[in-house]
Every structure is written in C-alpha cells, then in structure tokens.
Amino acid sequence: MRPLSDRLFPSKKIHSHSAAIINVCIQEVFMISLNINGKAYQVDVAPDVPLLWVIRERLKLTGTKFGCGIGLCGSCTVHIDGKAERSCQTPVGSAQGRKITTIEGIPENHPVKQAWIKKQVPQCGYCQPGQIMQAASLLAEDPHPSEAKVIEHMNGNLCRCGTYTKIKSAIRLASEGGNK
C-alpha cells in the first residue's frame, strides 16, 4: 500500500521528511460498528482511539468516567462480552462486533445498583459507575463470591473517598438477593 501522503497528494512531490510527518499526523479513519447497551452505532474514527472517548465524546454516554487514562483506576470500566474491561485501554477497533455495556445499560432494578442505594455507597460518586460495573461482572461470574474473591476482583477499582467497606457490604447484599 502506498504511503498516506502519496494517496492524499498524488500529483505533488513531497520531501520525504514532510511525507513522514504527514503520515504520522494523519490517521486513517474507518467506519466502526459498535453494539452498546443493545443499540447499534456507526462511528467514523481511527481504530486505535480508546473506546472510552468514543463512548463519552461521540455517543454522549457520559456515565463511564475518565480517571487515569492508563487502566489502573477502574473509573472507565465497561462490560465487553460480559467481562469487565478498561475502556481507556481498549482500542475502539477491537470492540467492533462485540457486545458492550456501559453503566447506562445496567437496569435501575439491577441488584448491584439497588444494593448501592440501600447501603448508601457513594460519597463523591465519581468512581461509582466503574465500581458498579466491576461488581456486576463479579456477581455474573460468581453469584455468591467469598470475601477474598470480592477483594481480589475489586482490587483494581480505586476510590479516593475510601468507601471500600460500603462497597464490599453492597456487593454482599447484592449477592444475598438484597434481603438485608
């Protein structure tokens, strides 16, 4: 395949240094098909753009938060094919054809959301969408996890307010069917 600069400017003779800069600065854009919260979307975007930015900026689903941008805090957690994934580290091209669920796609009557309300988990609330997504994926995988498994599974989701005790309590409540 010819360099992008040759395809953009076929009749121009471009110095090789300038051509290299053009090729680095201009990314090819593709039409990407996404299934988010059961709805089909088509976005024209470079395939290496993080899924987080497509979700927030292009599709205006702003429940998924930007925290660290390097996959360490968990604020950007979404479900991809039922598994918790960091959307800031997921290239949108790799999400094509997969089932994506954001916090907006989790029903209000979901046991985890209801437990979060009953246990009054949020303080500032910024990390809560990611915490809920991580907890929901845990309970989908293991409906009655041990405390050790809860701690292990939730370990990568950070909370500046330190509501970890309430988070664990809410997960326990959700795993018991919300009966406490």
Model-derived segments and spans:
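Short, Lys/Arg-enriched N-terminal segments with co-localized hydrophobic residues
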Residues: K13-F30
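Signature of N-terminal electron-transfer/Fe-S-associated modules in redox systems
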Residues: C25-K180
